[in-house]
Amino acid sequence: HVENKPIIIHTMEAFQNHPSVDAMVVVTLPAWIDVLKAYAAQFNITKLKYVVPGGKNGQDSIRNGVYELEKHHDPEDIVLIHDAIRPMVSAEIISDCIRITQKCGNAITVIPCAEAMMQTEDGVVSIGSYPRDKLKRTQTPQGFHIGDICELHREALKAGITNSVASCTLMIEMGKQVYFSAGSEKNIKLTTIEDIDI
C-alpha cells in the first residue's frame, strides 16, 4: 500500500480518470480476482469491466486479457497494455499512446537511453558498446487495435513463440515494426521497496 491504497489502485485511477478510456481489464492470479473486484468497488473504479486469471507467463497473461476484450469490443478499438506496477503513468503518456496508435497502428511508450550501454557475453567484461542515440528504453502502456494484437498472439502461438517478455518484443519477434510514443522518467516500474520511496 502507498498512501493507504494498493499500488494497483493508483495505477487504475490514472486510467479511470482519463476521458478516452472506456473500460479496463485486469489480469491477475486466480486467488486475487475477488480481492481486486472488492478493491475496485471500495475505490470507485467504475471502468473495471473484466478481471481474468493470468497465465504461466507474461505473454500468456496478456493474451488472456486481450482475448477477453475481443469478446466484448470492436476489433478497431484500441487497447493499452500496461504494467500494474507503473502507478505514475500520466494522462499525457496515455493520450500520446492513444494518438500514435490511431495514427500508426501501434504505439510503444519509450524514453531516451541516457546511460552508456555495454555489451558483454559473460557478464564480467565488455565486448563493445551500443550508441545510445540509437536506443530507446521501453515502458508501458503499449497500444494496439484489439483485432491486431489478438491476431498477433494467434500467429505467435502457431510460430511456437510462447514466452516473449513484452508486447513490443513479440511484435519484433513476429517481424513487425513498432512506433514510439512519449514516456517519462517518472513512469517507473516499482520492482523493489526502494522504488516506493521515489
Predicted regions mapped to residue ranges:
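Conserved core of the sugar-phosphate nucleotidyltransferase
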Residues: M88-S181
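Hydrophobic packing residues within well-ordered alpha-helices of enzyme cores
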Residues: L36-A40, C97
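N-terminal glycine-rich phosphate-binding loop and ensuing alpha1 helix
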Residues: H1-V35
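Residue-level signal for inorganic ion chemistry
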Residues: I8, G65, D83, P112, ...
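Hydrophobic helical membrane-anchoring modules
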Residues: N187-I198
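Short phosphate-binding loop-to-helix
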Residues: A41-D77
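Short aromatic-hydrophobic micro-motifs that form the base-stacking/packing surface
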Residues: I78-H82
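Hydrophobic C-terminal alpha-helix "anchor/cap" residues
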Residues: M12-Q16, A40, L69
